[in-house]
């Protein structure tokens, strides 16, 4: 892959090579969240660890959603080199490829049917990582995805009153990722607003 992020993180994670700080590089990483989100704080912990492991030769500038491009354009911006890396859930791009639902935190589980430990085992040892790489190729993106923070399925929601039937359910408006989740809500007559 042509992305420096891929090469350097692969070396750091698997070989442990340290590079001189004279060749320091700062990678711009745009998230799909604001910088106060817990997930972004965990991302900063990860990038701080990478900076420590590389003796300061690799640093990250974490940018909030929309800093360079809109949320929906984050993946394309990485592919085109406008930003060095992005941080999001893969299911944001399920509208581009339905298999993206397998690798994110789909609303209400999205039919995956396994817990986080089983998911991590499948990803690491059961062929999931290879399918993840194949996903990006099939989407025509020249990127390398890394799994950080597998969070499992998102909750369907928190409601002020019990939902007794679909008529009750259709009274609500949902925030949802673009792609399959948003389309599913639309197909069953529920108003949804795509994130981003």
Regions found by a protein language model. Give the residues of each.
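Extracytoplasmic "Venus flytrap"
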Residues: 28-45, 65-69
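Sec/Tat signal peptide C-region and signal peptidase I cleavage site
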Residues: 14-24
């Amino acid at each position: 892959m042509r992305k420096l992020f891929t090469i350097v993180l692969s070396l750091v994670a698997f070989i442990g090579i340290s590079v001189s700080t004279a060749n320091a590089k700062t990678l711009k990483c745009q998230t799909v969240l604001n910088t106060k989100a817990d997930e972004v704080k965990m991302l900063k912990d990860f990038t701080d660890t990478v900076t420590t492991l590389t003796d300061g030769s690799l640093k990250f500038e974490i940018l909030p959603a929309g800093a360079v491009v809109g949320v929906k354009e984050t993946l394309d911006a990485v592919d085109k080199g406008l930003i060095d890396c992005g941080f999001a859930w893969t299911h944001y791009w399920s509208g581009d490829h339905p298999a993206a639902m397998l690798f994110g935190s789909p609303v209400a589980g999205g039919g995956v049917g396994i817990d986080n430990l089983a998911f991590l085992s499948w990803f690491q040892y059961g062929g999931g990582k290879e399918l993840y790489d194949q996903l990006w190729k099939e989407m025509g993106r020249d990127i390398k995805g890394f799994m950080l923070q597998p969070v499992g399925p998102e909750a369907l929601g928190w409601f002020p009153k019990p939902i007794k039937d679909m008529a009750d359910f259709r009274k609500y408006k949902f925030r949802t990722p673009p792609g399959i989740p948003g389309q599913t809500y639309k197909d069953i007559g529920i108003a949804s607003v795509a994130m981003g």
